[in-house]
Swiss-Prot record:
Associates with components of the U1 and U2 U1 small nuclear ribonucleoprotein complexes. Residues 625-637, 668-686, 740-759, 772-789, 796-836, 867-876, 1011-1022, 1050-1072 have a biased composition (Basic and acidic residues). InterPro entries: Matrin/U1-C_Znf_C2H2 (IPR000690), Matrin/U1-like-C_Znf_C2H2 (IPR003604), Nucleotide-bd_a/b_plait_sf (IPR012677), RBD_domain_sf (IPR035979), RBM20_RRM (IPR034790), RRM_dom (IPR000504). It comes from Rattus norvegicus. Residues 639-650 have a biased composition (Low complexity). Changing residue 645 to A: No effect; does not affect ability to regulate alternative splicing. Residues 631-650 are annotated as: RS. Phosphorylation regulates the subcellular localization. Phosphorylation of Ser-638 and Ser-640 in the RS (arginine/serine-rich) region promotes nuclear localization of the protein. In contrast, phosphorylation of the C-terminal disordered region promotes localization to cytoplasmic ribonucleoprotein granules. This is RNA-binding protein 20. A zinc finger (Matrin-type) spans 1141-1172. The keyword RNA-binding applies. Residues 853-863, 970-979, 1073-1102 have a biased composition (Polar residues). Residues 839-848 have a biased composition (Acidic residues). The modification Phosphoserine is found at residues 638, 640, 643, 645, 652, 729, 789, 853, 864, 879, 881, 963, 999, 1034, 1046, 1057, 1066, 1078, 1096, 1101, 1190, 1192.
Amino acid sequence: MVLAAAMSQDADPSGPEQPDRDACIVPGVQGPPAPQGQQGMQPLPPPLPPPPQPQSSLPQIIQNAAKLLDKNPFSVSSQNPLLTSPASVQLAQIQAQLTLHRLKMAQTAVTNNTAAATVLNQVLSKVAMSQPLFNQLRHPSVLGTTHGPTGVSQHAATVPSAHFPSTAIAFSPPSQAGGPGPSVSLPSQPPNAMVVHTFSGVVPQTPAQPAVILSIGKAGPTPATTGFYDYGKANPGQAYGSETEGQPGFLPASASAAASGGVTYEGHYSHTGQDGQATFSKDFYGPSAQGSHAAGGFPADQAGSMKGDVGGLLQGTNSQWERPSGFSGQNKADITAGPGLWAPPASQPYELYDPEEPTSDRAPPAFGSRLNNSKQGFNCSCRRTKEGQAMLSVRPLQGHQLNDFRGLAPLHLPHICSICDKKVFDLKDWELHVKGKLHAQKCLLFSESAGLRSICATGEGTLSASANSTAVYNPTGNEDYTSTLGTSYAAIPTRAFAQSNPMFPSASSGTNFAQRKGAGRVVHICNLPEGSCTENDVINLGLPFGKVTNYILMKSTNQAFLEMAYTEAAQAMVQYYQEKPALINGEKLLIRMSTRYKELQLKKPGKNVAAIIQDIHSQRERCMLREADRYGPERPRSRSPMSRSLSPRSHSPPGPSRADWGNGRDSYAWRDEDRETVPRRENGEDKRDRLDVWAHDRKHYPRQLDKAELDERLEGGRGYREKYLKSGSPGPLHSASGYKGREDGYHRKETKAKLDKHPKQQQQDVPGRSRRKEEARLREPRHPHPEDSGKEEDLEPKVTRAPEGTKSKQSEKSKTKRADRDQEGADDKKEGRGAENEAGTEEQEGMEESPASVGTQQEGTESSDPENTRTKKGQDCDSGSEPEGDNWYPTNMEELVTVDEVGEEDFIMEPDIPELEEIVPIDQKDKILPEICPCVTATLGLDLAKDFTKQGETLGNGDAELSPKLPGQVPSTSTSCPNDTDMEMAGLNLDAERKPAESETGLSPEVSNCYEKEARGAEGSDVRLAPAAQRMSSPQPADERAQQSSPFLDDCKARGSPEDGPHEVSPLEEKASPTTESDLQSQACQENSRYTETRSLNSRSPEFTEAELKEPLSLPSWEPEVFSELSIPLGVEFVVPRTGFYCKLCGLFYTSEEAAKVSHCRSTVHYRNLQKYLSQLAEEGLKETEGVDSPSPERSGIGPHLERKKL
């Protein structure tokens, strides 16, 4: 028999120290906490006011205790054979505590892993139970009973158990002996309470610690242990829950409950244990009690070990543990008679005590703590069950009541919920009801009143931790283990989860328990939204918690079953969603463990679950990769609609379990946009109709997407690169893509594409001009985006316009192109070209609008023939530009080197002239530029020229400024043209040279020409169709420009008139440039292999200048790509023959023209300097553009370069 030596201690002894002790204060018993022992480690839960206890029960208890003492080896007269000496006891206690703490720490570490937690809890419970003295030792050590003179903490557990009157017997180890038995001091213990010093023989009892020996021996000890949660069996977590409470090995609350429970009866320990109330904290356990009760926190196992070890101590230990509610046959009777033994609090019907149920509300609080603790052990939510909630009436529930309480599906319908008195007509209504607030509240109240506290409010019933720990008052004990008394609490938990009280989700243990025994690993999902729920939605609910092995989606009944790979995963899922209801399309779902299936044997017809899940995962991965690639809200590079997750954003919680279960990406991370695409890709058919989705995107996005996004789609691969640029400024992206196109075209003989485009450009020329005029204004704002901060600063007035125009153009282009692609490429080309001319989207449109050139360049990069064909196709259908863009993108990177391969490195300069149209004087310059073509071959230089030409007037001014500011200009140029940025260093030197040279030459026209040439060269190198398109749009003006430009440029070199001309003609040039471009395209076609072509390109350079203005934007994006390859010599015009070949931009001499113009002009340094220079020109050009008529003194500064270029 287990002697529960409850020492009735004066209320005072415990004092405030009690909270620190591990001894649990039984909620029912009110009394000052016993003083904390030296080893007291954990604060006791605050004692609840003791229910009034009939005095009659106390004598009975005393008598029982006396009997137990007589029988118990630890009887008052005899020493506890297990206790050798206070020192050894202390040592044992310390060791036990240390071991327990370690185990607990391990348990905490695995809290999120229900399987591991369960195993660990079992081990812990076994360890605790296996040590007869462990609980005892632990109690004093944990509780640190201060009474023991030896310093052994006498955990006078103030067990104000609800079950125990304030006079509840406190088991105190002999304080002097440092008896392992914690003294549960029930400070308010009535004086008449029979105080039996548990170790009177062994250790003198402190007068303050009168020990009342409860005859717990029968079943008490074990039950007490069980009270502590059939720790080893089902509630190891709960047992530790007390630890979570702060008691090393016990759930403080449970300990309290156990104490109270134990106190309540002779077998209160066992009773407490059963109830999981074994709320006598460790204190509670007298030496005897500790042995079995030490389990206080450790259920069955302790009892088992206690049996052997403390068999003498606990006569009914095994049976008690096994029969938590009965606390063993002996205790069971006692417990059942508990009301008689212990007068239940006036409010509590002890006579109705159910061994499975907590002894009393007060005890249940401890028990509740226990449940909470176990929950903590498992779910760290043990505290959820409030002690108040934990306090449940002792009244047992009827079987049907338990079923309703647990939320089990009724056997017959319609069914009236015995808890809520609500009639339900079908299972769906029942599930809704069970998960509803009304039922949860009723269950909570009922559990409090009926002592079902152990039943965790597993709204699903699945999560009920109670199942795990009978301590939870496993209503299942009543239901499943009707005779829980015989069964250990562990058994009870079978359906403990059935409890729907959300308050008691010791779900993990209960859930595991319940599910393992019942539902298995299948989760039942109800209330799915009608018609809008897909398989992916359902699967996504489970993926965060682990692998989903199978599922059934019953759309007709709006329910689904998910089979998880592991029971723990299913339980975790249910528990989580009970706490945070899942939502699909804004509708809450009812998720619980399935009582119908333990596992899904049937396979999804037609669709392989693994395949669907794999699709979901793969899409998530893709989304993750794309998101990583994405910068900002831009669309994924891939056109594939699959860029987005197949399934809608997961509704499942982002809980830590997601990472733990790692069955896939966090569905909660999925985007809403992903979810939008889901309907098309639902059922895992993400691959289905990607083209359709793409078409859909193309149809709708052109209006919705930014110009950047449109370009991205239109240009495909180019869009990929440009995304990064786009994110910052769409203009640069386009220009970048244009630049790429130029490079490709440059390599690819874009002249053919341009020739093809000439008609288009001509067609587009008229509207294009008007647009160009408008967009010329808009381009200025654009330039800041394309051009870097320097450009933005210097060119802000103009740049601002340009970016806006470019954006609108590009947006229109992309939209128009897509529409046209869907409808006709011709319309798109027109708009695109107009946009190019206007927004200087020459590059983009070279890529997009004049896909012929762009495609040719892009695809031509892949193959020269495809280039031409693509150019034609692009011209015919801009929509082709997208695919071309995709192909082009990868090829473009590789093809940058194609200039060398094509052998037109310095020659191929098919410019995208759309933007040059703005500046008519540039056309003249362009003519001159063809002469300078070889120099212009430096595409970057041409691009820069474009930018400046775009700026028009600004170019002239920029030139003037450049001569004084060359170093500064170089940076600004680099700003406008990132390529130049690469060449900043050299550019500074070159600028220094240029300053003198420009000053000497004083040819602002040359400067503008040079820039134009550069622009042309850049575009020529790019050989974009955009210029071609522009040329086509306005072939005549282009011709005129070509004619005018070359002479005019020459003249300009001699004089600064071109500067004025470009400034004045910037709108005119825009218009004329298309024509010039058309002619130039023809020329470029011829001259692609020649410098002559470069010259023709130069004649287009005004447009190119605009394009370049954009290009500066693109150049930044290209800078890493193009400059890294540096396959295209740019700014060749800056290389001037002197004693050697001198680069004005970089200030470097080369003995060989090839080394200077080919190698050097491809160098990063040269590119950077050219960028800087063009940026400066662009800035100046913007300023001049604002004052269109203002000639460019700066151009005169740039002139020297242009002259040298001409030379």
